[in-house]
From Swiss-Prot:
One of its GO terms (cellular component) is cytoplasm. Belongs to the UPF0235 family. This is UPF0235 protein TGRD_618. Pfam families: DUF167. Transmembrane segments: none annotated. Gene3D superfamilies: YggU-like. It comes from the Bacteria.
Amino acid sequence: MIIKVRVIPNSKRNEVVSRVGSILRVKITAPAIEGRANEELCDFLSDFFDVKRSMIFLRKGERGREKTIEVLGRLEEELNEVLDTIP
């Protein structure tokens, strides 16, 4: 499943803030320096979607705040159920 994510780095804690249409807004504690926020985002999303870290792929947006993430390892219906819990 492909997910669009807008990252907010340097936050107090890692959390999914909201979902605006098909875009997730995610706060990450790591700074946007040398890919640290990207790594922490992938780690956080693997926990959030309950998949292995190796099943999360950053497909686009390595240097920007808007990212395209691919999540594998679970059925799309299961991932949609997780997404539906977000306000």
